[in-house]
UniProtKB/Swiss-Prot annotation:
One of its GO terms (molecular function) is toxin activity. Coiled coil: none annotated. Belongs to the neurotoxin 12 (Hwtx-2) family. 03 (juruin) subfamily. This is U3-theraphotoxin-Cg1b. It is found in: Secreted. It comes from Chilobrachys guangxiensis (Chinese earth tiger tarantula). Disulfide bonds join C52-C65, C56-C79, C73-C84.
Length: 87
């Protein structure tokens, strides 16, 4: 019984991780259907909350995610959880 419970928990955890990774990949590819109004709004709000909300002084390929004193990212860079991400 304990073995089955452990297998069920591990399987559920793996599915949650796989689903989160797939959602991140789809978000990065901007795959949002027009009929997904609520999903689109949630994605915009999420981007507004996380985009450049940290100092993001990390440099990627020698280019800063955002310039000194700037509040927004430029050049296609976005700050996500204090990492520079190219979109």
């Amino acid at each position: 019984m304990r073995t089955l419970t452990l297998i069920a928990i591990v399987t559920c955890a793996a599915l949650v991780i796989f689903h989160a990774a797939a959602a991140e990949e789809l978000e990065a590819q901007d795959v949002i259907q027009p009929e997904d109004i609520f999903t689109g709004v949630a994605t915009l709000e999420e981007d507004r909350i996380f985009e450049c909300s940290f100092s993001c002084d990390i440099k990627k390929n020698g280019k800063p995610c955002k310039g000194a004193g700037e509040k927004k990212c430029s050049g296609g860079w976005r700050c996500k959880m204090n990492f520079c991400v190219k979109f």
